[in-house]
Amino acid sequence: MTFHGDAEYASEPDGMSKSGAIGLSRDNVPFSHGRAIFINPVPFKPSSTSSSVYSFKTSFYFVISPRPKNPNPGHGLAFIIVPNDRNDSASGLGYLSLVNRFSNGNPKNHLFAVEFDVFKDKSLGDINDNHIGINNNSVNSTVSKKAGYWYQSKIEGKNRWLFKELKLSGNGYRAWIEYENGKVTVTIGRSQEKPKRPLIEARVDLSKVFLEKMYVGFAGSMGRGVERHEILDWSFENSAKD
């Protein structure tokens, strides 16, 4: 991994991140933000001119923890796929170390992200202070949903789908993100067992977002509210042939 901004790998308990976790921001520094990027680029298209995009899937366990003496949340973290392993003048606050107010929405960003947001920023179109969203080249999500998962329960002899909200701030969860044939699914749960119904299922055209090779990792940021943003484990694979 390469680390940018305030992100780091905590090999020892240091007050910022749990031992062995990837920390994306410093929980004692307001407005802290950073990125942790896998060191090698990953192929996402057969060629630079191809309109085909390789399918991919990733799973990770994350924890967002506000400090006890400063319970204000801010702002969240994101799984990211980006064109390089630098931070490129990205900003904190609601920009989540993805873009800044000048670059937000620029198609040249070549950015795909799934955000786990714990602060409602009206100027960026956030639906609430506890949501998950899909972002292309922008922190303004193309689709977002209240954080939680679907489960089935038998009611009056019939199986019904019920929704359970999950509070992102102050808890740890496992997330699954998958892309295949132009469709992105995002699922979140409390355990290793993946819920059968995704939280988000959306058609997303990544053919113009992705370059032939991209970098994969995480980003996180804070405002005046301070909290830990940690990744405790992570797996990623795609359909590209070695």
From Swiss-Prot:
Superkingdom classification of source: Eukaryota
Matches recorded under SUPFAM superfamilies: Concanavalin A-like lectins/glucanases
Keyword list, A-Z: Lectin, Phosphoprotein
UniProt cross-references to Pfam families, sorted A to Z: Lectin_legB
GO terms for MF: carbohydrate binding
Residue(s) carrying Phosphoserine: 207
CDD domains registered for this protein in UniProt: lectin_legume_LecRK_Arcelin_ConA
Gene3D superfamilies the UniProt entry points to: 2.60.120.200
Record's signal peptide: none
Protein name: Lectin-like protein At1g53060
S-S bridge residues: none
Family statement drawn from the similarity comment of this UniProt entry: Belongs to the leguminous lectin family.
Chain intervals for the UniProt region annotation (Legume-lectin like): 3-237
